[in-house]
A protein has these predicted regions:
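Acidic/His- and Gly-rich active-site-bordering loop/insert found
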Residues: 6-91
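Zn-dependent metallopeptidase/amidohydrolase metal-coordination segment
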Residues: 12-25, 78-82, 349-399, 407
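Alpha-helical metal-binding/catalytic segments enriched in His/Glu/Asp
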Residues: 19, 80, 90-129, 214-220, ...
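A short beta-alpha structural unit
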Residues: 34, 265-272, 284-290, 316-335, ...
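Flexible, glycine/charged-enriched surface loops at secondary-structure junctions
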Residues: 60, 115-116, 174-179, 229, ...
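Acidic, glycine-rich active-site loops and adjacent beta-strand->loop/helix elements
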Residues: 63-65, 84-86, 120-131, 193, ...
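Midchain, well-structured core segments that form catalytic/ion-binding scaffolds
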Residues: 127-128, 132-292
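His/Asp/Glu-rich mid-to-C-terminal helical/loop segments that flank catalytic regions of hydrolases
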Residues: 230-256, 299, 304, 374-412
Length: 412
C-alpha cells in the first residue's frame, strides 16, 4: 500500500497559505523575522498542527521545535524539517515548504493507518535566515554542536535585545539541550532558490551537497578631499580602492570557473557626497564553492589583491571574517534514494549542489542527511514574488514521503 501512497496535495497547499497569513505583507509575501511576534504566531500555528496530529512537541534551549510521531520501536528518529523564519521581504515557500510538507507526510501516513518502525520527526530550526540575529542557520549549527549555545543566545539585534530575551518573550525558550535526541537521518525538502530547475524544466533536484561559504567584510580608510582640486595622482580614494576590489571579485570568480561565485552585496561609502573624495568604505565579499581547496585559493588571491590595492592607492584596509563554512557533501544513501524515487515516480531530475546555505548542512555532521529541491519560478527567492507551482510542490512532497518511509521502515 505504501508503495503507491501519495500526500494530500490540496491540504499541503492550504497549509502553506495558512502559515503565510502570519506576518503577511500588504503587497504579498511574508515578514517573519526570528523570535518576533510574527514568528511566535507562525510557531504557534505549526505547533497547533503538530498537536492536532498527536505529535510529542519538544522545544530546546535555542528555540528549535520538534514534533515526534512515535514509531513501533524505540529507535533513532528519521527527521524532516527546515525553518519558518523569513527575510524582511520573504515568500511563502522558503523553509516553510519543508516544514509543512514534513507534517503532511505524517498526516498522510496516519490517514493510511501506517505507523513506521522508526519514529518520524519534523523540526523547524530557529533563525535560519540570520536577519535579526547572526550568524544564520543558528538553530541547526547549535543543534549540531558546532557553535556554543551561550554565544548564540547572547547574540543581539539592532535594538540590543538578545536572542535569549527574544525567545523568552515569545515563550519559545525551551529547557532541552539542543541536539539531545537520537537522529537516524535527516531529509530536507526545499525550493531551489535558483533558476536551474525552472530553466531546464526539471521536476526534482537531487541535492549532492552545499557550497562552502566565505563572507568577509573590508573596511577602507582613505582621505576626504575636494573632488575638483585634488590631482588624481595625489588622492587616497577609499571609494576607488573598494571599486577595484569589487571588480576583482567578479574577475576572480570567472577565472577560477566551475562552481566559484563571488558577490559584493554590501557597499557603504562616506561621506557619500558628489563632490568629495570618499574617505571611508565598508564592503562585503561573499565567496562560495563546492570545492574547499578552490574556495581557499579564492580567499588567498582576494587577500593578496586587497594588500596590493592598499599599497597602490594609499588606503588602509582591514578585514574580518563574518562567516566561514566548509562545503558539505550529503550522504550517498540519501542522495541515491532521492534519485531512485524520482525515477520511480517518472519525474525528471538532475543532481546539483545547493548554492544557498541550509540547515541540512549542519545536521549532516550529526547523521546521514540530504535534500530535495523543487523548482521556483524564474529562480526568484527572498522576494515577495517567490513562487513554486502547486504541481511541483506536490511532486516534491511525494518524493519526500517515499524516501522517508523507506528510511523509517528499513530493517538494518
Amino acid at each position: 500500500m505504501s508503495h503507491y501512497l501519495q500526500i494530500n496535495g490540496q491540504r499541503l497547499i492550504d497549509s502553506l497559505y495558512a502559515l503565510g497569513e502570519h506576518g503577511a505583507l500588504p503587497g504579498g509575501g511574508v515578514c517573519r523575522l526570528a523570535a518576533t511576534a510574527e514568528d511566535k504566531a507562525g510557531r504557534d500555528f505549526v505547533v497547533a498542527r503538530m498537536k492536532a496530529l498527536g505529535l510529542s512537541v519538544l522545544i530546546d534551549a535555542i528555540g528549535n521545535v520538534t514534533g515526534v510521531y512515535h514509531g513501533e520501536e524505540t529507535l533513532p528518529m528519521v527527521m524532516m524539517g527546515s525553518h519558518i523564519d523569513t527575510v524582511a521581504t520573504g515568500g511563502l515557500y522558503d523553509g516553510n515548504y519543508g516544514v509543512m510538507a514534513g507534517l503532511e507526510v505524517i498526516a498522510t501516513l496516519q490517514d493510511a493507518g501506517i505507523r513506521t518502525r522508526r519514529p518520524l520527526a519534523v523540526t523547524f530550526f530557529t533563525n535560519e535566515e540570520g536577519v535579526r540575529f547572526q550568524p544564520d542557520m543558528m538553530g541547526s549549527v547549535v543543534f549540531a554542536g558546532e557553535y556554543p549555545l551561550a554565544q548564540a543566545l547572547a547574540a543581539k539585534d539592532i535594538d540590543g535585545i538578545t536572542l535569549d530575551e527574544a525567545l523568552r518573550n515569545i515563550g519559545y525558550k525551551g529547557e532541552r539541550q539542543p541536539g539531545d535526541m537520537a537522529v537516524d537521518s535527516y531529509v530536507e525538502l526545499h525550493i531551489e532558490q535558483g533558476p536551474i530547475l525552472d530553466k531546464e524544466q526539471i521536476d526534482i533536484g537531487v541535492v549532492t551537497g552545499v557550497q562552502g561559504i566565505s563572507w568577509q567584510e573590508f573596511t577602507l580608510r582613505g582621505v576626504s578631499n575636494h573632488a575638483g582640486t585634488t590631482p588624481m595622482s595625489m588622492r587616497r580614494d577609499a571609494g576607488l580602492a573598494a571599486a577595484k576590489i569589487a571588480v576583482f571579485a567578479r574577475e576572480l570568480a570567472l577565472s577560477l570557473g566551475g562552481n566559484q561565485v563571488a558577490t559584493v552585496g554590501h557597499f557603504s561609502v562616506k561621506p557619500n557626497l558628489i563632490n568629495v573624495i570618499p574617505n571611508h568604505v565598508v564592503m562585503s565579499v561573499d565567496l562560495r564553492n563546492t570545492d574547499n581547496a578552490i574556495l581557499c585559493l579564492a580567499e588567498q588571491q582576494l587577500a593578496e589583491f586587497v594588500a596590493k590595492t592598499s599599497q597602490e592607492e594609499g588606503v588602509e584596509i582591514t578585514s574580518r571574517s563574518l562567516v566561514r563554512f566548509n562545503p558539505v557533501i550529503f550522504a550517498d544513501e540519501i542522495v541515491n534514494a532521492v534519485e531512485a524515487e524520482a525515477e520511480r515516480q517518472a519525474l525528471s531530475y538532475r543532481r546539483l549542489p545547493s548554492g544557498a546555505g541550509h540547515d541540512a548542512q549542519f545536521i549532516a555532521s550529526v547523521c546521514p542527511a540530504g535534500m530535495i529541491f523543487v523548482p521556483c519560478v524564474d529562480g526568484i527567492s527572498h522576494n515577495v514574488k517567490e513562487h513554486s507551482a502547486a504541481k511541483d510542490l506536490i511532486a516534491g512532497a511525494n518524493v519526500l514521503l517515499q524516501v522517508v518511509l523507506q528510511r523509517a521502515q528499513r530493517m538494518d
